A protein has these predicted regions:
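Metallocofactor- and cofactor-centric catalytic cores in central/energy metabolism, strongly enriched
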Residues: 1-400, 407-468
């Protein structure tokens, strides 16, 4: 049983509380989202939240004391020896014949947006692709497709080895993404990421919808590019939405700017939705591997077979070995914002983070840059950094990223990035950032009711409703 509790609102020192029959008087002010002790702690005694240790007491603490990063220390150290202890997953979730309005592509895949993307092979042409996107927007007055977007980046040259290969993989995944109704790939000509080699690297693609321009090989790159874009626009603008079963939806699960409510409201909501989507035959993807440390065995024991278990061990230990090889401790993850919001250790963050994927079996484990092959719950190799992780989720083929936040963030990647607030204060203060408020879950709306509303909203977004 948990031996700390979380304050839903700011609680003053001297407040008398009854928690699960335990009478408590608070010894100090407890900010909303933060923990207080339900018992007296001896130095070194484990602090339990979500039913698992989140660290140990650095010093003796009294019942009613504020428990935070100053008095809780992580239990995480180096590499661990893991044992496969599979559990039986039994989820009684009814199948519903739900559909959304998506775009059926020539290869049979489905997109939830119909956008024209301009993707550079190298950062040297960033200015050109921006001019082209703006030019097409002016000509079309923003009509006919969902968006016309240039995707500048700083890579594609002065890169070798894995760095270069990873750049190629992510750019390939973008070019092939079904949310793009048409793509213009713009190269320079002398870069490491050679356009003709990159073209071969794509594998099969729709040559009517993916075009290339090498700027060193044309006279006026703006006029040449606009001519190609007009042709792509003429084709993409004829695409229409059609009914698509929910089983074809793929979502990425992400959190950033987490707080003490993340593991109580928004992340469990995503977990409930993920289980529902998987029960309908759909797909969800969890990443942020370093933020699994401390909760990884929960995922390992839900792997469908021992091969997936071994792949998950490799996924976890690869990141741990990377940190250790650079002299970095594996447990120093929580940011200043996390701590201010009530998260004290990486274990606490991880136990909240992994709730986003519900209770379903793990059916796939993916390296960085790989595209989705299996339905169900997939684990994807990427760091906790919001920009990298969200982009990797989108590159894997996710139609949208479901992003929970307690502190707030405006970031979005190249697919619809829905922000779900963990608390109502954030939703009220940042309506331009937040798309869905999960804070109502601690305001007496049952999780099941919130999830029903969330499912309806996801279907609307998949069918074309824009997010902030």
């Amino acid at each position: 049983a948990d031996n700390v509790a979380v304050a839903i609102v700011n609680l003053p020192a001297g407040e008398h509380l009854s928690v699960d029959g335990i009478e408590i008087t608070l010894n100090e002010d407890i900010p909303a989202g933060h923990k207080f002790a339900l018992k007296n702690f001896a130095e070194g005694e484990n602090v339990i939240k979500y039913g698992y240790p989140i660290g140990h007491a650095r010093m003796a603490k009294k019942q009613g004391d504020w428990m935070n990063e100053t008095n809780i220390k992580t239990n995480l150290a180096g590499l661990l020896d893991y044992t496969y202890n599979p559990i039986q997953v039994s989820l009684d979730i009814p199948h519903k014949d739900l559909t959304f309005k998506g775009y059926r592509r020539k290869n049979g895949d489905v997109g939830v947006r119909n956008e024209i993307w301009i993707i550079p092979t190298v950062g040297c042409v960033n200015g050109i692709i921006g001019q082209l996107a703006e030019g097409l927007r002016r000509e079309t007055e923003g009509k006919g497709v969902d968006a016309i977007v240039a995707f500048p980046h700083n890579y594609g040259c002065s890169q070798l080895g894995d760095d270069h290969e990873n750049t190629k993989k992510i750019l390939r995944d973008m070019v092939l993404h079904p949310n793009a109704g048409a793509v213009l790939v713009v190269g320079l000509g002398c870069e490491n990421n050679q356009p003709d080699v990159f073209r071969e690297f794509l594998g099969e693609f729709d040559e009517d919808r993916v075009k290339f321009m090498v700027t060193q090989k044309v006279g006026d790159e703006y006029e040449e590019g606009m001519e190609i874009l007009r042709d792509l626009y003429a084709k993409a603008s004829k695409d229409e939405r059609t009914d698509v079963p929910l089983s074809e939806l793929r979502v990425g699960l992400k959190c950033g700017g987490s707080d003490g409510f993340s593991g109580i409201t928004a992340n469990p909501l995503l977990g409930m939705f993920s289980d529902f989507l998987i029960a309908q035959g759909g797909t969800s993807v969890l990443t942020e591997v370093p933020e699994m440390f401390g909760a990884e065995t929960i995922l390992m024991n839900r792997c469908k077979n021992e091969e997936l278990f071994e792949q998950t061990v490799h996924l976890i230990n690869d990141f741990k070995e990377y940190f250790l090889s650079h002299g970095e401790p594996v447990g120093e993850n929580p940011s200043p914002g996390n701590k201010a919001g009530g998260i004290s250790t990486l274990e606490e963050k991880a136990l909240g983070c992994t709730q986003k994927c519900g209770k379903s079996y793990v059916s796939g484990v993916m390296p960085y840059g790989e595209r989705l092959q299996k339905k169900g719950l997939n684990l994807l190799s990427a760091p906790g950094n919001d920009l990298v992780a969200a982009t990797t989720l989108a590159a894997s083929g996710c139609h949208m990223v479901l992003f929970t936040t307690g502190r707030g963030t405006p970031f979005g990647t190249f697919v619809p990035t829905m922000k779900i607030s963990t608390n109502s204060t954030l939703a009220k203060n940042k309506p331009g950032w937040i798309d869905f408020n999960a804070g109502v879950i601690v305001e007496n709306e049952p999780m099941e009711k919130t999830c029903e509303r969330f499912i309806d909203y996801i279907i609307k977004v998949a069918s074309g409703e824009f997010v902030n």
